[in-house]
């Protein structure tokens, strides 16, 4: 009996491109600049641009002092910075405050970079290390770093995509901030707005804690999440209500069980999350240009995530098929030697059980691909046939062992004649 040689398979290649900003926002609809009506207003207050001279000095807390005293070496990685903070601070509240302080004071806003969509499959670890090394970034970088530090400290956190209203008008670009679960309750943090402001294309440091640990409804006066779930409200505001500052009391809105939705969101993969986000956005009322842009971006990311999911399943199936082939070939070589030197029965059985388990996983992975673009179907079908071939071979050897173990030990050698 000869070994079943491993067949070569061309790896399915899918070129995935990270999406950048799809549409410029230099010219905005005049509707964005409507001031809030006084009747039934949601109290969307203006956040005026402030200079260091116009802000009352803040009284530093103990967590602030700990953050400001962090040695340079501690800020070289997420783990080392959180380890330093935990040497001096113990509660979620203290750690969240110190992290906000450190990020807002140590990261400089990069005025030469604009908002771009982050690839859902991007390597966050590399991005965060780049931020820590360069000590500069934009809102995405502030939010990503804050989230990473908070999660390292043991709290749940999310980066939130959205847009802003200031001085009665919508700001022209998307923005990112964070939600963190501090001491069992969700709060909002915007370390970018806590770092300073941009004037005449220059970043003016103006560290403050006005956007540190705010209740969701408080930050909702100026920050509108694209995903209604991140309002953390049973009655989310529609985009139009936020844009105008007027709550439509006649608008029929079913109770939104955001906590259950968030729990499901935490369990979803990238594709499932994107699909559910898009559905929630579409159900949240009339869109403005920014929301429309994000809907288009999300639709594109859904397509990319779908391709990536196919690629991941294919590569997993191919890897498992290869391992199963190697494992069953090892058994074949041992069988060709008439089980010499003799191994314990359990060890011999495992030589077939292992490839069987591997090929079953490969079969599950390849069959998880329900639909695929036409150009990917041929390699998928080819791999499926190869998996079936290995599975058949494994089953034949499994039947052989079943008969082998039924015989008395002295008669087993006859199985190899």
Where are these regions (language model features)?
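Generic detector of well-ordered alpha-helical segments enriched in charged/polar residues
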Residues: 79-86, 97-100, 104, 129, ...
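Hydrophobic/aromatic-rich core segments of domains that either
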Residues: 101, 141-212
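Secondary-structure boundary elements
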Residues: 38-134, 138
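Alpha-helical transition-metal enzyme core signature, strongest for iron centers
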Residues: 103, 139, 143, 355, ...
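Short glycine/serine- and small hydrophobic-enriched flexible loop segments
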Residues: 105, 148, 329-332
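Mixed-charge, low-complexity segments
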Residues: 14, 24-34, 72-73, 85, ...
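Bacterial Sec-dependent N-terminal signal peptides
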Residues: 1-37
